[in-house]
């Protein structure tokens, strides 16, 4: 079988399954609760957060976990817009982004007053860097191009 939908769901690597197995079978407590059974889950998440922060040079408080890419895209765009809206309201993206980006940009346009520029791409999916440069204004607060 040839599987061509890895952008949506990718087979889990065997070493990841092995590392996660204890959390599927023994330590499956809700890490957000206060009872003792959840302590192992909470500790594992805290350790993972610190490890990721160390690898990328961030603070552990800057590491967030979401349910997946769409939620992450949605959260990143909305949070960035809200955090920087006092500096501008312009977002740049492309016409071929994932729907999580496009739908969130549409929401920000309609409901939050964002101005969004949707760049064209060439036959290979690349943007023209000159067009990107021309699209940037003093009001630009976010560029989201995958």
Write out the residue ranges for each language-model feature.
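Pyridoxal 5′-phosphate
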Residues: 1-146
């Amino acid at each position: 079988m040839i599987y061509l939908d890895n952008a949506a769901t990718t087979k889990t690597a065997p070493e990841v399954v092995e590392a996660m197995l204890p959390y599927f079978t023994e330590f499956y407590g809700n890490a957000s609760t206060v009872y003792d059974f959840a302590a192992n889950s909470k500790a594992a998440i805290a350790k993972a957060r610190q490890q990721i922060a160390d690898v990328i040079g961030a603070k552990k408080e800057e590491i967030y976990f979401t349910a997946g890419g769409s939620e992450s895209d949605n959260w990143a765009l909305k949070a960035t817009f809200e955090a920087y809206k006092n500096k501008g309201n312009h977002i740049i993206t492309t016409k071929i982004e994932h729907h999580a980006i496009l739908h969130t940009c549409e929401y920000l346009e309609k409901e939050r007053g964002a101005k969004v520029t949707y760049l064209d791409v060439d036959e290979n999916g690349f943007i023209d860097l000159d067009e990107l440069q021309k699209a940037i204004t003093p009001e630009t607060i976010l560029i989201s191009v995958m």
